[in-house]
Amino acid sequence: MAVDLIEASAKDDRYPVNLTMNTRLFGKSTALLHSVPGEVNETTCNIQITSFDNEHWEAFKDCLMERWLAIPGSRPHWAKQYQNLPGIASKLQTVYGENLETFLRIREEENVDPDNIFLNPFLQDLLISDPVSAYQ
């Protein structure tokens, strides 16, 4: 999917990816917010695309993320750039479901990060504010 989009862009003389495309393999995890849930019994490949900002990057990134997020059960890497996609908070709530609720409950009960120093604005909106309306 990513390679196809890169090749299509090149045919139109657009080069949104100007550094690397890396892969990372993950096994299943019981961590509540891991991108590979514990019920998955296969190795999962995550793709990371690194690019210096250029005139074609934003459109490429948004198009690719929309395609990836359309895959049932897909879970984006928490540290990547997808915060501006419409409906992303709802998507995250859906795919993480009960795990997200459990994470928030434990976070509150154990008083983890009471000053929210480990939250960026997107995570603060998603985890603390009304997550359904965050970034819709």
Predicted regions and their residues:
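Activity-critical C-terminal alpha-helical subdomain
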Residues: 56-60, 66-136
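Short amphipathic C-terminal alpha-helix that caps PH/PH-like domains
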Residues: 2-5, 64-68
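C-terminal substrate-recognition/cap domain of FAD-linked oxidoreductases
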Residues: 1-59
